[in-house]
């Protein structure tokens, strides 16, 4: 995934106890500096104190071990519960009964555990992930967790996937944003980025007043009661701040809080971590991780530690994994590295427009090679490195010197790729025809594809089929959405037996069917839906009927084209489909993936959480695991 060694295409999701984790094409050009500049400005006003922690877990900053009550939704385990696996490989509770749906087991840790021997933890095989406390309250250095950096380094050095949590004192949205900046400051200081975390950044909500109701601590150290709406606003302020930088966000609370105070459906767009020390979690709402006990024993960790179960496989890539990088070109490189260890040929297209890369899908299919993106003026660093890594000796550059400068040809040769072939026409339709001619001469395909040139979504969805079937894509003219005389002539010369039109009559003129029949094509089929997102699902459904698979399929954003341009080639090579989504239209997940989830043993999400949001990622994982 362009990602950390642990997480593949991160996902983020979980929170924590003591106080209280998938970029690209727009993939996620993550501009760290503006927000980090804020995070670096440590507040020096009034500061809270760890002794102000009061909750079902803390009494004036001290951990409470045995005094939880049933009213809190907590029933404590006996000391030393094992939580191991049974003979069938199922995670079990303290009574040895399987925990339905539990995929991964982890711990959450803070300075309360002292210095942890992470190598011993790793070698014990006791856990799959860790959630690390970074601190508590607003952005003050004396509220940093004393073991945060040691714990991060221990996880990094030993390949343990991890996420972050912060114990909240916030009683206002401004304080919540300060708490988010507290997290961001420490992540930046630790040298971490959204690519580093396998799990989300969690807000730990448990601070309460003497009556047991939710509260915050103001800058005078006073306890302030919080209404349900205030809690929702505080949570949104914190989560939106960390999400703006590209991190996934989550919320931690016990069942009492989730049932009575954190009740709105808006919380479902973040990873939900539920604490209930019981043999089962009885919370009836959606949740992704369960904190089952505070009394587990793990080799390498002195004393008791919280044990948690991940039901989505967020850090373990159980089915879906993200492929992404710091920006769209990093994502493109990661996609190429995922699909190819070597390739004698590459196709290079500009990242500045989508037509050339899309219509090059069949050409890439002919040569079983990746599609690489570059800037127009010079060869991108990422494409340069991947050409060298793959050992390519031939590069097809699609697009003329306006699309990609002539100097790029020589830059490609300097990578060791000695043969550069330019394929282009006078405009995007002409380049599509030139590419199609190459494909026809090499493979004599029996099918061609017709798409609009004024938007990219329809052709994105059919690109894997074009690669797999080696079916050329022809573009309609701008404005009219009709086929030009030159394109009709090229189609007729292709000798196709069938043609596929992607998009409705607004995208591709209703008269195009007749024009294709006049070109001698006996079978013409149009595929479309109400919007481009329904069209995407319809195309994928049709592709499966043609023999393509949903296993190893991919999901990408429909807001931009970068990730799917490169990803379409990977899907085509795998013989799998690609669907697109956006936050306001997840038809691809709900209508296409959901009924086919049993057929999917692995799948990809192209792009990080700025491209395919954390909410969409959670919806996908919850759909796959039946937890929605």
Predicted regions, residues:
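Solvent-exposed loop/turn segments at secondary-structure junctions
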Residues: 111-115, 135-140, 168-174, 207-211, ...
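Extracellular glycan-binding segments that recognize GlcNAc-based cell-wall polysaccharides
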Residues: 16, 316-628
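N-terminal secretory signal peptides
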Residues: 1-14, 23-34, 40
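Functionally critical loop-and-helix segments that line ligand-binding/catalytic clefts
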Residues: 41-113, 124, 265-319
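Structural recognition of the beta-strand scaffold that forms the well-ordered cores
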Residues: 105-108, 128-133, 161-166, 199-205, ...
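Loop/turn elements at helix/coil->beta-strand transitions in domains of secreted/extracellular proteins
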Residues: 125-130, 158-163, 192-200, 243-250, ...
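Catalytic domains of cell-wall/extracellular-matrix polysaccharide-remodeling enzymes
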Residues: 194-283
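Substrate-binding cleft of extracellular glycoside hydrolase catalytic domains
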Residues: 91, 96-235, 415-418, 423
